[in-house]
Amino acid sequence: AAERSERIPDIVIITGMSGSGRTQAMHVFEDMGYFCIDNLPPRLIAQLAELVGINTGVGRHLAVTCDLRSQGLFDELLDAVAALEEREMSCDIVFLEASDEVLIRRYSENRRRHPIAKPGETTADAIQRERLQLQGVRDRADMIIDTSRLRTSALRNKLRMAFSELSDQQLMDVHVFSFGFKHGMPVEADIM
């Protein structure tokens, strides 16, 4: 079992392979009360952190996803992290990845083309090219999560254990209510 982090960073940057679950991870951070922005260019992270009021003592946290497929954006990300550290804002990079087979299957199931696939290029070739482009970011990441065999609930638990200020009891949300079978089972009921 993962241990709860002693330090919750002010800013979490979520990046990684296309199709590895960045959007799902962003939903988890949103549920934990983070201010979330999807596909933010790295050079805007420090400015956004100041606008949102990160590091002002109000206990607010920021999560952003960054799409780093273009080589210049990796350098921008490192510059952004350095700028945050200069402003005494803590920052963690979470890198999500999955095996080639799983990524190919996910793109096939969704009937989507890989975002960096060139005309006539196979999904497998595009994935390999993207993996090479992102190797430097992966090496710099504070947390690497392989989502190949993870269900969304397991990803949620990993991220909550690492980045939530709430205790396990506060993370569990239980609603008890009564109903009549005459009107059918409540649609929002998970367990009866």
Regions found by a protein language model. Give the residues of each.
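Conserved nucleotide-sensing/catalytic segment adjacent to the nucleotide-binding pocket
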Residues: 30-82
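Pre-Walker A (Motif I) flank of P-loop NTPase domains
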Residues: 7-12, 59-62
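C-terminal accessory "lid"/substrate-recognition subdomains
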Residues: 1-3, 125-191
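Short, hydrophobic/glycine-enriched beta-strand segments
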Residues: 10-17, 174-178
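Conserved C-terminal guanine-recognition region of P-loop GTPase G domains, centered on the G4
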Residues: 77-87, 99-101
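A glycine- and Lys/Arg-enriched "phosphate-lid" helix/loop adjacent to the NTP-binding pocket
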Residues: 89-134, 143-150
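Glycine-rich phosphate-binding P-loop
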Residues: 13-29
